[in-house]
Amino acid sequence: MNNYLRKLVEGQHLTEEEMYKAGLLLLNENILESEIAAFLVLLKAKGETAEEIYGLVRALREKALPFSNHIQGAMDNCGTGGDGAQTFNISTTSAFVLAGAGVKVAKHGNRAVSSKTGSADLLEELGVNISSTPNEIDYLLKHVGIAFLFAPAMHPALKRIMKIRKELNVPTIFNLIGPLTNPVNLETQFVGIYKRDMLLPVAQVLQKLGRKQALVVNGSGFLDEASLQGENHVVILKDNEIVETSIEPEKYGFSIVKNEEIRGGNSKENAKITLGVLSGEKSVYRDTVLFNAGLALFANGKAKTIEEGITLAAHSIDSGKALAKLNLLIAASNEKLERVN
C-alpha cells in the first residue's frame, strides 16, 4: 500500500491495474484503518480518473456476493449521494415509478452516509425487508419487478470501510462508485452524481461495464439528481457512443423549483413524502420525481424521448401502479422465501 500512497502524495494517477490491486488491499483485514483513511483522502484531493474508478469497481465486484447470470434486462437508478443538499429520497421514490412503468429495477443502496435518510432507512421505514439474499433478490426481480440490494450485505468486505467513511464524513471515491458496484449484471442505468467534472469518467466506466444505455446527470446546484432549479448537465451513453449535453426542466413543462424546496428530513418525514408522491398528490416532490423517472425511462429505452418518459412516469403514478409495486415489495420481501434459499 505504501507505493500507492506515495504516488498519490506526489499527485500521480494510478493505472487501472494499480487501482484494482490497491482496491483488493483496501478490502484486506490486515491493512490499517489509518492507511485506508489516508488513501481515500489523498485520492479525493488528487481527483479520481476513469481508470482508477474502474479499477476499484473491478475489485469490489470481484469480492461481492455472487449473483446468477440469468437476471436479464435489469436497471438501477442509484445516485452517488454526497451533494450535501439533504433532499428527500428522489431516486428511491422514482424506482417504484420505474417499476410501475414495467422496468425491472435492481435498486442498490445504503443507509445514510452524508444525508439524514438513506434509501435503506427509507425502505425500512416503509416496511420493506432490506435484508434479501441474492436468491431472494432474483425471485423479487422476476415476480415483483423491483428488489433492494443493501450494499453492506452485498459487499461484506466493505464493513470496515463503511465505518471509516462515516468517521471521515466527507464524500470519497466510494460515493462515486456506489452506483457502479451493483452486483447484478445491469443492462441500463441512470446515475446522478454530485461532481460535475466526473460526468464523463463515470459514463466511461458504465461503458466499460457493458451497459447498453445509460444517462449520467449532475443537477443544477450540483445535485446528485436531475433538478428543477435550472440547467442539468448530462452525459448519455447509447449505441456505445457517449454524448455530452444539458437539459432545462422548463422545456418539459416544469416550473422552477429551488433545491431547498425539496429538502427531506428523517426517515418518517421522507416516508410521508414518498407515500404522498406515489399516492398521486400534486407537489414539487411529485414534479421532481416525474423529471427524474422520465429521464430514467429514457435512459432505459422504455421511452424513446424524455417527453414520453415523463408521460409514462405520470401514468405509473396516476394509475396506482407505482404504489402497487411498493406494496408488493413490502409483502414479498417479508415472506419466508424458503423455496429460493
UniProtKB/Swiss-Prot annotation:
Mg(2+) 1 binds at S91, E225. Signal peptide: none annotated. One of its GO terms (cellular component) is cytosol. Its EC number is 2.4.2.18. Anthranilate 1 binds at G79, N110. Mg(2+) 2 binds at D224, E225. This is Anthranilate phosphoribosyltransferase. It comes from Bacillus thuringiensis subsp. konkukian (strain 97-27). The lineage of its organism: Bacteria, Bacillati, Bacillota, Bacilli, Bacillales.
